[in-house]
Amino acid sequence: MTETNETISRRKQMTTAIIGVGNIGKAVARHLVEGGERVVLAAHDGSKAAALANQLGELASATSVEKAITEADVVLFAVWLDTLKDLIAQHTDLLRGKVVVDPSNPIAQDANGEIARTLPDGQSSGSVVAGLLPAEAHFVKAFGTLGAESLASEANRTPRAVLFYATDDDLAAAAIERLISAAGFDPVKAGGVDAAVRIETSGTLHQFGGLNGKVVDANEASTLMAMAS
């Protein structure tokens, strides 16, 4: 049976694979488990994924990248963009039919350990990643609009902080709205994949871009979206 956005939002149990357990992956995993979602963790260093799963309890487990993708309905790659591109190339067939969540930003550490942009101005990592995925994957750009510290600390505040997302896929939209809500944030769609550049670093809707370090709520996000339309 073909999955629909309605069935995925209503399903009682959904499994999210989180590939990478650095600051972003760890924060998302913790928030999702606290929100009642099941996660399966994988990382280059499997012992770190196993240790985090043990901390998070019965809704979390750890395994290999290949098994995590296979078991999951949703796959979130919490890794640097270059690593993400390699992982897609290695696991293309397994990603068919999966909702793929990309929180990456077009940045990396240079030879001096400084953070530098890795793509030309105006090009988003979201558009790059979407172009590498198989046609059967359901792509969404999300969980990368806040810095790692804010992502970890701003969940479930009052009023709720917003996480923007971008997708052209209804199934991916339903899944990410469920996950963002479970993680303790309000989901707000910025647009299709062509809007990904707005929610990445230096973009108009990114904390370290047009928001000038601010974390916004739904009312503020609505005003920002209206100003941009």
Features from the language model and the residues they span:
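Rossmann-fold NAD(P)-binding glycine/threonine-rich loop
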Residues: 104-140, 145-149, 154
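Conserved SAM-binding loop
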Residues: 41, 76, 165
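NAD(P)+-binding Rossmann beta1-loop-alpha1 motif at the extreme N-terminus of oxidoreductases
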Residues: 2-58
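Residues that mark the start of a beta-strand
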Residues: 14-15, 99, 162
